């Protein structure tokens, strides 16, 4: 009898650990952006999400969240002499993550066209007015909602490069529509245009 209670207790503890492990795995799906983060936007922000296929220059800074494709970005880069794209994560807070507003201000101060493009919906509804349209990668063409995957595929299309895209290098510079490189800091990207 004593032995059965001990076995029952062991099974109960085992079940608790299995349940905790399963819960941890499910919550890590959210953290790793395995789930579609669009559904975490507030209803008001979801209503502001707009698919667009026109020129980025025609978009307004009107609090809409514009879904863009790689061809629109390539066209924009061809129409402007110096462009720096900032692949930013709105909810990613680290000392190395440049604020999108600061990025836009720094580009304007240096006579460079700023193109901050969000790679995730998480926190995008909290981004304050940038002075440029709020742009988000349209990930549906890549048939994945994992931001690491669709971001690499998107920038591979934008750059027309066979080089490996490193997600930690968040700045892409273009001169007269030609891809110059992928950089870790704004300063490196700016220097590449001089």
Residue ranges and their predicted role:
Residues 53-81, 85:
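N-terminal secretory signal peptides
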Residues 74-102, 115-117:
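Short active-site neighborhood of thiol/selenol oxidoreductases, capturing the structured segment around
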Residues 165-182:
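A short, hydrophobic beta-strand/beta-hairpin element that forms part of a small beta-sheet core
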Residues 25-28:
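C-terminal motif of bacterial Sec signal peptides marking the signal peptidase cleavage site
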Residues 1-12:
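N-terminal secretory signal peptides that target proteins for export/translocation
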Residues 30-33:
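Bacterial signal peptide processing site
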Residues 122-168:
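Thioredoxin-like thiol-disulfide oxidoreductase module
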Residues 38-58:
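Post-signal peptide N-terminal segment of mature Sec-exported envelope proteins
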């Amino acid at each position: 009898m004593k032995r059965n209670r001990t076995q029952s207790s062991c099974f109960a503890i085992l079940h608790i650990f299995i349940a905790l492990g399963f819960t941890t795995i499910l919550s890590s799906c959210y953290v790793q952006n395995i789930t579609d983060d669009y559904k975490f936007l507030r209803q008001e922000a979801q209503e502001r999400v707009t698919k667009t296929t026109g020129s980025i220059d025609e978009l307004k800074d009107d609090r809409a969240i514009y879904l863009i494709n790689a061809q629109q970005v390539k066209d924009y880069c061809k129409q402007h002499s110096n462009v720096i794209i900032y692949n930013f994560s709105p909810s990613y807070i680290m000392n190395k993550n440049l604020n999108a507003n600061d990025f836009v201000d720094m580009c304007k101060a240096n006579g460079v066209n700023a193109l901050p493009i969000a790679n995730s919906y998480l926190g995008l509804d909290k981004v304050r007015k940038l002075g440029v349209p709020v742009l988000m990668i349209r990930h549906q063409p890549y048939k994945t909602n994992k931001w690491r995957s669709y971001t690499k595929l998107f920038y591979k299309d934008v750059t027309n490069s066979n080089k490996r895209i490193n997600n930690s290098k968040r700045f892409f510079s273009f001169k007269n529509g030609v891809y110059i490189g992928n950089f870790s800091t704004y300063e490196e990207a700016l220097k590449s245009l001089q």
